Amino acid sequence: MKTFVAKPETVKRDWYVVDATGKTLGRLATELARRLRGKHKAEYTPHVDTGDYIIVINADKVAVTGRKETDKLYYWHTGYVGGIKQATFKEMIARRPEAVIEIAVKGMLPKGPLGRAMFRKLKVYAGGEHQHAAQQPQVLDI
């Protein structure tokens, strides 16, 4: 018996919608990364993008445990000399709630072209509305 190897043109991708309300950030991000990679499928192949499309709604209502709301810091650089910036989790949720989930999931995906292709299948929205109704996403309870 030969080992099955998925081909990019034969992979079937589904669309799922996940409500992040009250979900713990890390636990949500690990499951999203797993499904974006396709590891939940029997035909998973490490060098082929076999994952599904994931839509996350209510990203502004994601939760963290302990004192991470005030202690967890996000850093970025503006590109100018001395341009290092930082914001707490609470400030990031107020400024750009989508970025919190995107950063958490991106760190759990492979680095390189395949990981970037997987990350493009993640769609995150701060509110309860999304623009992917035509894809008929199934509700995924995590």
Curated annotation (Swiss-Prot):
GO MF term set: mRNA binding; structural constituent of ribosome
GO BP annotations listed: negative regulation of translation; translation
InterPro entries with a match to the protein in the record: Ribosomal_uL13 (IPR005822), Ribosomal_uL13_bac-type (IPR005823), Ribosomal_uL13_CS (IPR023563), Ribosomal_uL13_sf (IPR036899)
SUPFAM superfamilies per record: Ribosomal protein L13 (SSF52161)
Alphabetical UniProt keywords: Ribonucleoprotein, Ribosomal protein
Pfam families the record matches: Ribosomal_L13
Disulfide bonds, paired cysteine numbers: none
GO cellular component: cytosolic large ribosomal subunit; ribosome
Subunit organization: Part of the 50S ribosomal subunit.
PANTHER family named in the record: LARGE RIBOSOMAL SUBUNIT PROTEIN UL13M, RIBOSOMAL PROTEIN L13
Functional description taken from the UniProt entry: This protein is one of the early assembly proteins of the 50S ribosomal subunit, although it is not seen to bind rRNA by itself. It is important during the early stages of 50S assembly.
Family designation: Belongs to the universal ribosomal protein uL13 family.
Name listed for the protein in its UniProt record: Large ribosomal subunit protein uL13
